[in-house]
């Protein structure tokens, strides 16, 4: 007779079986991970993992359902059904249940699923009858796709066959309807990744050019025919042998990365995050002089791989579109010229030997597309021919005057320049025609600043320049639109854009090397001497305007005069301004903001005025101070402020103040200070609509220790980014502090609640006296922690000998400016001005400083002491 002891023995036996199954899974996972590290091909490991889970599920089924059951079936679907199970992939199951099955069967299935959870499989599952499957699949493309890859594991074959019959293309989701749905799905998926494969932390599975692109090809062809794998695509004439090999190699590479991510993280991780890139690069055997070079080499191979997958995905889907959706359509070719014809609004070579017999047609095809806006693209067979004949673009081709003429014609067209350069890049023609460009295709820079590969960034620069020409985008940057109308030969700007980063990754300064490449390009393309000089100059100096605007004091007339001497004339300034704005906006769209736009426009306007005045006329400080006072006084009188009130404020402020602020800002400050009683200090005001493309925070307070450090600590805690800081000490012991700030999103703070919150928090903190600032509790982002920058301090001389210019390079982190302020206070340093710049994870800040007596730090001992304290406070984190 059974009793409590018997029940406990049964429970212990069941527990032991569960524990044993868990141990088997863990052992299999560890064994496959180890074999992966020792070089076993990933395809073998995936097959073995799939077979192992198949066997495990069959055992569990036998225990809970019984192999002889005819009213139920277990089907693997999704990636598992496809036989592509990685270490931590989802185990997706469909359980088919006969409508006539006894009610007890549902309990059996519940026990079966509970067992799977107990042993750690965590399956995704659905339980349906064949009729329910068909009904659900009729309106849900995800379900029909899963069923398409279904694989019977155990149970009733008749039930599974009924599902296959009920969901056949004749009954639902014809191959044409399925194709259109999958194309729409891919467009949505691509948009989630900004329609580019070139993301710094790409998704290996879902991103453009990832494994999902390969799977989508298989789904569409399988719905249309009896093809089961990629190999069948060759037999059915969809792929050539070479394309099949390229696709298989890409799949193996992406599988390898995804398998490594699963092994490394112990979970289903498909994102190639910064956290893993360096480790995977080492694991895959990449080498380089620096750790960054190792990662960049690995990621360049990744980006080139996914670009190839994207290209093959596009080719195959277009082939399918032509062969299936338009199979019965009668389109008569329309001749375009001797080499091409139009078929259904797509360009097609008139015969397969066109490119072999007329190699220049490899460039001509893109020019024809530009000149015929009704053409939607190139037919798939012709794309394939282009790829097969790229080897014809050799040195003789590149030096052929007719080839050079065709390429320049492409750049000179009034429309389609960006589209066709992108198409040339996709098909591999641009890299073949410009081999130096080919070396930067897929090349990333391992930082948070450059969010695109070099080739993608370059084509975005061209796109931005093209937008400046179009009235529909005039409001994006009115000055750029206005200036572009003055450009006589826009193609020179496009050439400079193509060349400005073409030498990235080469030995030496990429601007200097790029200048030499640009000179050779101009010689080969018969560009005139004057135009060649302009292109060379733009490539060599493409960074000078952004560096000046973001790192130097634009209120200093000498800075403007020096920049004007570099530029020399208005035409060069116009070209450089357009190239600079296009370049910055194409580097990292999230880092472009109204502040940077205002800085560049201020530099452009000031330089234009200096050029009109004449480079031989030295800056006149007294004249500019007098002009600023006159304009500000006119505004103040309009506001009704008495002359004696104006004088009372201004006589306590040095002349330097009138150089560093605009007349409108001077008038605003003066009005506020004149109305402020001492008992109301600290005075904290916000100007939401600053002339500098940001919110200005103005503080008037008694000068004391930690004032800058306290203020920046509070601004940091409030989630504000400081872009610029000016500190003026009055003759009566007061300090005027002006900060230009934006939200971390790059937008200006707005809304009454937010503006009042900023003022109140600052007043509260500054009313507490001269105590050291509180520690900033905000944490650094996950990404920044992977890009530490060694702290470096440099000193530069001020041409006017008013300040010492301190340059701090460090890892950007919460509370950085507050720590700098504390270091200045410790060493008796007076801060007058600060230019704050963040390049990804790298802070590049410029401080204009003096000692307590307002003298520059000339002595090496003083500079060394300050450097030592700064590094102590800022440190390397």
UniProtKB/Swiss-Prot annotation:
What cofactors does the UniProt entry give for this protein?
Answer: Mg(2+)
A biological process (GO) of this protein is:
nitrogen fixation
Activity modulation: Uridylyltransferase (UTase) activity is inhibited by glutamine, while glutamine activates uridylyl-removing (UR) activity.
- Keywords in UniProt for this one? Hydrolase, Magnesium, Multifunctional enzyme, Nitrogen fixation, Nucleotidyltransferase, Repeat, Transferase
Record-annotated ACT domain positions? 696-778, 805-877
This protein's source sits in the domain of life called: Bacteria
Q: What is one Pfam family matched by this protein? A: HD
Q: Where is this region: Uridylyl-removing?
A: 336-695
HD domain ranges (all copies): 454-576
Task: Give one GO term, molecular function aspect.
Answer: [protein-PII] uridylyltransferase activity
Among SMART domains, the record links this protein to: HDc
- Name the InterPro entries for this protein: ACT-like_dom_sf, ACT_dom, HD/PDEase_dom, HD_domain, NT_sf, PII_UdlTrfase/GS_AdlTrfase, Polymerase_NTP_transf_dom, UTase/UR
Uridylyltransferase: where is this region? 1-335
Q: What is its EC number?
A: 2.7.7.59, 3.1.4.-
Provide the catalytic activity annotation: [protein-PII]-L-tyrosine + UTP = [protein-PII]-uridylyl-L-tyrosine + diphosphate; [protein-PII]-uridylyl-L-tyrosine + H2O = [protein-PII]-L-tyrosine + UMP + H(+)
Family listed: Belongs to the GlnD family.
The record's comment about this protein's domains reads:
Has four distinct domains: an N-terminal nucleotidyltransferase (NT) domain responsible for UTase activity, a central HD domain that encodes UR activity, and two C-terminal ACT domains that seem to have a role in glutamine sensing.
General function of this protein: Modifies, by uridylylation and deuridylylation, the PII regulatory proteins (GlnB and homologs), in response to the nitrogen status of the cell that GlnD senses through the glutamine level. Under low glutamine levels, catalyzes the conversion of the PII proteins and UTP to PII-UMP and PPi, while under higher glutamine levels, GlnD hydrolyzes PII-UMP to PII and UMP (deuridylylation). Thus, controls uridylylation state and activity of the PII proteins, and plays an important role in the regulation of nitrogen fixation and metabolism.
Name of the molecule in the record: Bifunctional uridylyltransferase/uridylyl-removing enzyme
User: What is the organism of origin for this protein?
Assistant: Methylococcus capsulatus (strain ATCC 33009 / NCIMB 11132 / Bath)
